[in-house]
Amino acid sequence: MTKQINSQQIAIDGPAGSGKSTVAKLVAQRLGFDYLSTGKIFRAFYYLIKENNWSIDQLISNFNKYECAFNGDQVVINKENISQLLNDPTISKGASEIAQDPKIRAYALSLQQDYANKKPVVMDGRDITSVVLPNAILKVFLTASAQQRAIRRIKQLNLELNKATLEQFTNEIQQRDDNDTNRKLAPLMIVKDAIVIDSDQLSIEQVVDKIISLYKQRLGVNYA
């Protein structure tokens, strides 16, 4: 049975630190699509769990009582923008932990797919290409060497780039890659119909241009 391709969905996956969120946001802006950072959904989940001292089951039971808006990488809950709060390392770590739970992953999946079915969208995150948007017209796996991703992360944090710092960050990224690849639920993987883009020698703008070009090719028409 031939699957129905959705021409208004672009899915971008890749390892931690590959720049997929930055790229996805810019691609969406260029195309006039919505952008959704799916990782922010899990961070919002954990934020509510932490604030209310809830279990995962309690979160799922109560989440629809909140007025939540996910707009790109901005998250607003009951008219309060909590986006900056979600960047806290504790929230990030907790989000990664609860994302291993099948129940919360299934709940997030329903929210993500409902969002994607309402409007043209570019999404980035784990299992976007394999589970969340399996019929997306374009699936991209964005990658880069662990060392290059470490350098980018060090610069992003405004830290001094030296041998010790580079070694530390590279080791941490390699460990994260191993964990993500070998975990049982939603492991890091390249689906067979994804286009792999290695950004080691490419600027962000070049990666965005390449994805836009690939999208136009898939669409088969000129896209202004």
From Swiss-Prot:
Its EC number is 2.7.4.25. It holds the Pfam family Cytidylate_kin. Its main location: cytoplasm. One of its GO terms (biological process) is nucleobase-containing small molecule interconversion. It is found in: Cytoplasm. Gene3D superfamilies: P-loop containing nucleotide triphosphate hydrolases (3.40.50.300). ATP binds at residues 14-22. CDD domains: CMPK. The keyword ATP-binding applies. One of its GO terms (cellular component) is cytosol. It catalyses: CMP + ATP = CDP + ADP; dCMP + ATP = dCDP + ADP. The keyword ATP-binding applies. GO terms for molecular function: ATP binding; CMP kinase activity; dCMP kinase activity. Keywords: ATP-binding, Cytoplasm, Kinase, Nucleotide-binding, Transferase. Belongs to the cytidylate kinase family. Type 1 subfamily. This is Cytidylate kinase. It comes from Mycoplasmoides gallisepticum (strain R(low / passage 15 / clone 2)) (Mycoplasma gallisepticum).
